[in-house]
Amino acid sequence: MHSYAKIEIMKLENYHLESHNSDLAAAHQRKLDFISSEIPGSSAIIDKLVDFQIAIPSWALGTGGTRFGRFSSGGEPRNIEEKIEDIGLLHKLNGASGAISLHIPWDTADNPSAIKVLAAQHGLRFDAMNSNTFQDQADQELSYKFGSLQHVDKAVRKQAIEHNIEVIRQGIEIGSKSLTVWLSDGSCFPGQLNFRKAFQNTLESLREVYAALPADWKVFVEYKAFEPNFYSTTVGDWGQSLLYTSKLGPQAYTLVDLGHHLPNANIEQIVSLLLMEEKLGGFHFNDSKYGDDDLTAGSMKPYQLFLIFNELVEGMDARGMSHKDDLGWMIDASHNVKDPLEDLLQSVEAIMIAYAQALSVDREALVAAQSISDVVRCQEILQQAFRTDVRPLVAEARLRAGAALDPLAVYRQYKVREELIKNRGAKTVATGL
């Protein structure tokens, strides 16, 4: 492991949180008592919130940026060990960030056993592994400029296949159970490629990756409408992803990134149908105004986030699925003007709020209203849940998990970013950015 100095402030002690929670206890209890009297089954909702965990991607811990520039916040994690420590801090604060998702080759560990131990010390598990064939690496023999798994050159496809299999191997070493494949493969101009052959090449390549999966693993095929290719993307929408996963087999699932749709797509309907087909694998949560903006979850379209969770809760309950374990939950955001850790705390909070609101929907009343096509009543039932302030339930879940009633306030009170800059430097850049 690297010899970078430890930052004690990152390892907030229980007494720090206890002092903070004590100061807020009376006000919190008043709010909790009120909302508990308003929402039937609030105790069961809190129990589900305590169990719910959202993975943090390693690449979200540093400042993101755009093609026009990047403005570092300083103190960014310089290696996988520091990334684990940062996510451990988030989990200590909110009790709901108990998993880390690695991106290879950025996060290749020199000592996988030591990494597993470090993660366990912070109460973290390893979520999906992410491969990278959308950019060329320094030691790479062949280029992905014109695609990877779709490439017209079989040698390039073979290189990309071998990379994905290597990512699986690394994941096995640290205890991950899934692989996410996002491809930038596509074209920028009409006539650049044959759509059918590109699909067939990609499917053939994915089949070789699929064959390397351990029996208890899943592969998630992530789709995106456009960018970096702007005329066509070879896994461009949920229908194409569903085609791939259906042809691959029962261990293959579609992954939904909220920002990977065309504007105003009905994501909640997509979610419902993928659940119906037993092909929904997981989520990358973020928010957007125009494209794949990767903004803080719930910052632009909180009602849409609630509607998505409404379909998730209904669909998962209809199939007897575990909310905690049967889908992959992850944030995928880029932070250009915010402190990345503060942004992640906000995103987790927004996701938990939307989940709690969906759990509070009067399902029996909604089904009854739907059965007689009472459109007004259906809308009222959903908006009653959405407009109810469930933040005391989310805060109580944190309290029961041993975390902070107000994570962001604790983060700022102990000046965590200032301490990170002091120990890591003002000009550090997180790997992968």
Residue ranges and their predicted role:
Residues Y4-G65, G69-F71, R78, G88, ...:
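Histidine-acidic metal/acid-base catalytic patches
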Residues K11, G65, R70-F71, P77-A120:
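Basic, amphipathic N-terminal segments that precede the first structured/catalytic domain
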Residues L49-L61, I104-D139:
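Glycine-rich, aromatic-flanked loop segments that form ligand/cofactor-binding clefts
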Residues F68-G69, Q137-K158, L183-R196:
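Surface-exposed, active-site-proximal loop segments in enzymatic domains
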Residues W106-I115, L149-E166:
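Glycine-rich anion/phosphate-binding loops
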Residues H122-S131, Q150-K158, A198-A212, W238-K247:
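Acidic, His- and aromatic-enriched active-site or binding-groove loops in soluble protein domains
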Residues W217-P228:
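Aromatic-lined carbohydrate-recognition surfaces of secreted/lumenal glycan-active proteins
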